[in-house]
């Protein structure tokens, strides 16, 4: 014990400043005396043993002098060490002791290294860090946030509101002295001058390009990415963005709207109604309704037979007693697609029997049907409710319609079916949409195919340049087949014809059951062969027992029986529009089954003006 203590004391008396406890040995250092001739020096291999000794020494009872000692790592340069002067060379490095850099002795302060670069505090603290039960290293103070100019800024509490953060920072910014900083873009690397990297806001306007061409010398900045973005370029980009949005939403621009206003029959035509005016007509005229009896006359027939010309003529000579509804050509050609062009392009000889062709024909016929069924529904709002059909007089008024839903749902699909452009299922889907009302009068204008072709060429309507006389002949036969179907339903009930089409009952059996004369039986057989019934029977033959098929046939026959037909040979009245009207007027008064309906005349007239505009 004495030798170990003497040896330790002798090695430490050379520098009493380094070993402050040389005069008095503290209690609890039994391990130091047991080492023998250690000389107080340590090596890298003994570092872990010294740490264990330091931890164990805390178990003893230190003296008052030990309590006053503080084992902290210095955070700066020692006060007694001179600072090296600039310009006089580098300070010579002191020789490194062999025991330096391993473990600090009690009371020894580590000497910082001098040089161009000083070790960071975190590395020094990690290297010389001692257990927590020896001493507590104080935490470094939190760095105060600063702004872009180096001024301290108060910490802003975390909040989800952007306005709250701005309100907390604003008082500090007001206390700062105003600093004027010229706004300019930082110079970018040369590769950013490539057009790929140039922002579209940096594109120069026309004036800037002219200035660049004039200023060729000097230190003019010609790079676009060095220029400050201008207001004009941003507004141009916003306009381009709005144009893209309009294109996405299919909104017409001002130029297209001007073209639409000049287009006849468009919703934006001069004198046309606004959407609010159109909707108000559906709600009523707002005045007391004035009911009048009127004929519901639908003009039907092939194209070019004079339907539109007759409506225009009657509206001019007798406008007070006539309300007309023109053909919805604008909806067919301008709304989303041109169904007239589609039907003519699909019905080509090389497209026979293709399902894709049938899909196109179905799509076109559905668009033909849509405005007619909508008009039919709209007009029924002005018919006096729960009012039976009225007996006609010579002074009754007239409602003239350009085509009935019959053509779009039955006649033209029947023609496409016969020619091989429409599938069976698509024909039944269109026929199931046919509807009619009691009191509907269909004036069928017939004309020979040669005369009809001349009329089509004369009017020169868009999309009808490829119409042939064979097509007009087939179309006339389709209308005649529909007329024969309706005429046969005048002799036999719809239930009887469903039995013939869907059941194993012949037409002869039905005539015998109804006790019909031989002349009527012959007439019924002739009408049956010319009607749509034979074709319909071939279509539904594989599925005659299906409930949906039976319901389609029954509804079709019942709806078709509601209308009344008037047939006019228009070939006899070519160029004689009053003659065509005289024939229609005379047959309407002579046919007992034709009756009139009571309608709100003033409200329906207002609606017709809106519809035709």
Swiss-Prot record:
Q: Which GO terms describe its biological process?
A: DNA biosynthetic process; TMP biosynthetic process
Output the Gene3D superfamilies linked to this UniProt entry.
Answer: P-loop containing nucleotide triphosphate hydrolases (3.40.50.300)
Concerning InterPro entries, the annotation shows: Herpes_TK, Herpes_TK_C, P-loop_NTPase
Listed binding positions for ATP are 301-308
Q: Which residues form the active site?
A: 327
Gene (name only): TK
One Pfam annotation reads Herpes_TK
Extent of Low complexity compositional bias: 8-18
To which protein family does this belong? Belongs to the herpesviridae thymidine kinase family.
Report the source organism. Answer: Equine herpesvirus 2 (strain 86/87) (EHV-2)
**Feature: compositional bias, Basic residues:** 114-126
Q: What class of enzyme is it?
A: transferase
Q: Name one GO molecular function term.
A: ATP binding
Q: Give me the reactions it catalyses.
A: thymidine + ATP = dTMP + ADP + H(+)
EC number(s)?
Answer: 2.7.1.21
Name of the protein this chain belongs to = Thymidine kinase
Subunit and partners: Homodimer.
Ranges of compositional bias, category Basic and acidic residues: 78-88, 199-218
